[in-house]
C-alpha cells in the first residue's frame, strides 16, 4: 500500500500557491489574469 501523496501544509501552500508568489512572476500574473477573466471567486489559494 502506497502512502497518500497529499500531505497538507499551510506554510508550503502559501509559499508556492499564494497571491504574492503568483504576482512575483510574469507567468504567475498570467494565472491571476486568466482566473479573473474566468470569474473565479478565489484567484490564488
From Swiss-Prot:
Keywords: Ribonucleoprotein, Ribosomal protein. InterPro entries: Ribosomal_bL34 (IPR000271), Ribosomal_bL34_CS (IPR020939). Coiled coil: none annotated. It comes from the Bacteria. One of its GO terms (biological process) is translation. GO terms for molecular function: structural constituent of ribosome. One of its GO terms (cellular component) is ribonucleoprotein complex. The keyword rRNA-binding does not apply. Pfam families: Ribosomal_L34. Belongs to the bacterial ribosomal protein bL34 family. PANTHER family: LARGE RIBOSOMAL SUBUNIT PROTEIN BL34M, MITOCHONDRIAL RIBOSOMAL PROTEIN 34 FAMILY MEMBER. This is Large ribosomal subunit protein bL34.
